[in-house]
Amino acid sequence: MSDSEYLTRAEAALAAIERALDDTDADIELERSGNVLTLEFENRSKIIVNLQPPMSEIWIAAKAGGFHFRFVDGEWRDTRSGTEFFAALSEYATQQAGEPVHFEA
């Protein structure tokens, strides 16, 4: 994947997260600084989603751990488990919010 393809796909993922948070009733604050999204929950815990252009990856840091995602076969997939990005982010956010939170592309 070229650098421009990576950036287009990765930016689309960040935009999908922003849209989902606009539509949710969960109390999650969103801050964007460049290629980094910070989701802060009511309990003050955070999830950090950041782009890693040199690696062509998206990284998530959550209470559950650190995870790297690479674009494979049309989806962002965890480089270790193969879990789809939005499914994983939904799970981590649900755990930290204490209520269902859903993200999708």
From Swiss-Prot:
NCBIfam families, per database record: FeS_CyaY (TIGR03421)
Name listed for the protein in its UniProt record: Iron-sulfur cluster assembly protein CyaY
Any one of the GO CC terms: cytosol
Keywords: Iron, Metal-binding
Similarity section: Belongs to the frataxin family.
Source species: Paraburkholderia xenovorans (strain LB400)
HAMAP family recorded: CyaY
Listed GO MF terms: ferric iron binding; ferrous iron binding
Record Gene3D superfamilies: Frataxin/CyaY (3.30.920.10)
Annotated Pfam families: Frataxin_Cyay (PF01491)
Described function: Involved in iron-sulfur (Fe-S) cluster assembly. May act as a regulator of Fe-S biogenesis.
PANTHER family in the record: FRATAXIN, FRATAXIN, MITOCHONDRIAL
InterPro entries for this protein: CyaY, Frataxin/CyaY, Frataxin/CyaY_sf, Frataxin_CS
GO annotation (BP), single: iron-sulfur cluster assembly
